[in-house]
Amino acid sequence: MNRVKMPAPPAGVSAIAWEGLTRFQQQVYRAICRIPKGQTRSYGWVAQHIGKPAAARAVGNALNRNPFAPLVPCHRVVRSDGSLGGFAGGPEKKRRLLEAERQA
């Protein structure tokens, strides 16, 4: 059987849990780990960055299922108009996380 080598998990993420993700989720989570602290990128930017420019909504769905927050910083992804968009902890928590990163 041919095995495709999957990218290694981000620092602090269990390899066993990482293997339970889809390839798409892994790509999304690796991409958002590269967003610098205190900065944001849009769902569309993430989709473009992983080579799937029409998948912005799917990126949002993957982030909604992120079991590794805040190690995988989904709070750094916002809507294309710059508004916060969704976040499991609510928009106020997302805003506070971003503000804390900007001040650090």
Kindly give the residue locations of the regions a language model identified.
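Short, proline-centered helix/strand-breaking motifs
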Residues: 36-37, 67-73
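Regulatory, non-catalytic segments
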Residues: 54-66
